[in-house]
């Protein structure tokens, strides 16, 4: 009889994620001003201010809001996001239905870390890495007034 015994190292297992995710909640104030035409979207953009196509985006419908009085909230998540790079912003925008120019028809309504007083130029960037590949609670407020 031959007996083979093998052992493995008891060190930590290193997990290398292939992609990451960011998530949070957008609180919409004054939702009675929700646009009746056109659309509102949330996007994760590579640059700030946004230039070109976003890394990820989704449309937000009025029906998808959790409504309490005149405030609505929307929980978002962007998954399968490329790691080891910075993203310029997460922003909510409104598409002007009377402007066909894709470079001027999106109007920023709010951005993560940004303030209306600074016209959202102070939006925070987001960095996903092999070590920090899931970022949660990137919450911000959009006032539709």
Language-model regions, residue ranges each:
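Predominantly extracellular/luminal cell-surface or secreted proteins
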Residues: 27, 41-49, 90-96
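Conserved "repeat-terminator" motif of extracellular CCP/Sushi domains
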Residues: 138-145
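Short, ordered, surface-exposed loop/turn motifs in non-cytosolic proteins
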Residues: 31-58
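Tryptophan-paired
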Residues: 49-87
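Bacterial Sec-dependent N-terminal signal peptides
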Residues: 2-29
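Structured interaction patches on ligand/partner-binding surfaces of diverse proteins
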Residues: 95-137
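A short, solvent-exposed beta-strand micro-motif common in secreted/extracellular proteins
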Residues: 83-101
């Amino acid at each position: 009889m031959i007996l083979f015994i093998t052992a493995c190292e008891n060190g930590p297992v290193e997990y290398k994620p292939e992609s990451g995710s960011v998530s949070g909640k957008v609180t919409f104030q004054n939702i009675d001003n929700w646009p009746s035409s056109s659309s509102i979207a949330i996007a994760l953009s590579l640059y700030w201010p946004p230039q070109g196509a976003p890394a990820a985006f989704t449309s937000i419908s009025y029906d998808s809001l959790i409504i309490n009085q005149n405030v609505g909230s929307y929980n978002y998540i962007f998954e399968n996001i490329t790691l080891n790079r910075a993203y310029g912003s997460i922003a909510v925008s409104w598409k002007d239905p009377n402007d066909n120019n894709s470079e001027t028809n999106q109007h920023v309504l709010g951005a993560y870390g940004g303030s209306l007083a600074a016209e959202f130029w102070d939006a925070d960037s987001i960095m996903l890495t092999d070590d920090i590949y899931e970022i949660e609670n990137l919450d911000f407020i959009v006032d539709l007034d």
